[in-house]
Amino acid sequence: MDHNAFSEITPDIVRLAKMSEQADIINSELFTKYDVKRGLRDLNGKGVLAGLTHISDVRATETVNGISVPAHGELFYRGYNVKDLVEGFTSGNRFGFEEVTYLLLFDKLPDEKELTDFRALLSKYRSLPTSFVRDIIMKAPSSDMMNTLARSVLTLYSYDDRADDVSLPNVLRQCLQLISLFPLLSIYGYQAYCHYHDGKSLFIHQSLPELSTAENILHLLRPDSSYTPLEAKLLDIALVLHMEHGGGNNSSFTTHVVTSSLTDTYSVIAAAIGSLKGPRHGGANIKVVQMFEDMKKEVKNWEDEDEVANYLKRLLHKDAFDHAGLIYGVGHAIYSKSDPRAVIFKSYVEKLSEEKGLQKEFALYSLVERLAPQIISNERQMYKGVSINVDFYSGFVYHMLDLPMQLYTPIFAMARISGWAAHRMEELANNGKIIRPAYKPIGEDKVYINISDRK
C-alpha cells in the first residue's frame, strides 16, 4: 500500500463516519440534566477536585469578606512563588531549569554542591544509546515533531533492561534520563526531517556537558552553535515558566491517569506527549504567532488603535485569520486578571526585542495585550475576567530566537517533562487506586435481531 492509498478517505469511509457521528451525538441538555461537569470543570471554569498534590499551586482568587473574588494570578512550585525563583536564579547569574527541576522532584532548593552534582547527573544522561540516531530517528522522519518525540520515547523502552520496573528508584532514573534526552530527541528529529523532506544539509551536534539545558538547545539547533547570553537566558526562563502548572492540566492529569494503571514510564510520558500535542493544550503559541503574522498583513498602521481593535473584533466575529472566533493567547481556564508567567516574561521579552531590532513588533503585541481583554468583554458573555496567557509572548520569544515553528510545542515538552516526572513520582509514591471516573449510560435497551431480519 503506497502512502497516498494509506491516507485516502474513501466515499465509504465518509458514509460510515456520518453513521458513527449520528450514533454518537448526545443531546447537550442531558449534560445539564445529569449535572455532568464537562471537561471536569464547572460553569465558571473551575476544575472538579480529582486529586491532591504537593508539586505546584495555581492561584487566581482571593477571599474578601468571605467571598472568593478574582485576583492577579500567582504560580507556586513546591511552595515557592515562581516570580521569586526566577528573580533568584537570574540575579545570581545562574540558569534555572536544572535548579527548579531539582526543586520539583525533591521539594528542596539545592545548595551549590547538590546543584553541581545534579547538573553532572543530567549531563551524564544526555547521551542516546549507540546507533539510536541512525536506526530510529533518521528512519521515516515525521513532519510532526511531537509524533517523532513520542515514537522515540516509546522506542527507548526497547533499550532499557528495567523498562517495566515501577519502583521509585528505577522510575526516577528513567525520568531523569528523559529530562536530559528530550532536547536531543526533538532537535535531531527536526534535523532529520529537514534533511530528508526539505533537502537541507544534515548536521548533528553532540551535547556539551558544560552547557545548561537552554544553552544546549541553542547549541544543538543552530548550524554554527552560536547564541547570545540574553538568548540563552530568556530560553531558560521560558523553560522554567512552562515546566509545571498543577496536576489538573491535560497532560499532567494524563500522567496521573496512565501512571495509576502501573504501566511503564515510557508509555506514560508518550501519552503525556500526545496530550500536549493537541492544539487545545500545547499548540496555542503557534496559533498566536500565525495570528500576528496575519494581523501584520491586514493592519496597515500597527500604531492605530482603532484599526487594531477592528481586526480583533473581526477575529471574534470569525471574519479574520482562521475564522475560529478566537483571539489566541488571551484567556485562561484558571487565570482571569493576570497570568503570572506572562507578567514575568514580558520584561525579558522587551529586552530581547531591542536586541533583535523588533521593537515595533513588541509594541504591537503590547497594544493587543491592552485592547483584547476589553474587546472580548464587550463582545462575549463572560463569567470571569480575561487577560493574556503565557502563550501570548512565548511564541514571539521563539520567533525572535529563530526557533522553527515545528519545535514550539516540543520545547514546551522539554520544559514540562520535569513536571510530568514529578507527578509520576507523586502518583506512585502514594500508591493510589487506578483512576476510573464514571460515565452514565443514556442509551435504550434493545432486543437482539437475527441477521436475516435486519434492515
Would you name each region that the model predicts?
Residues 1-455:
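Non-transmembrane, aqueous-exposed alpha-helical and coiled segments at domain scale
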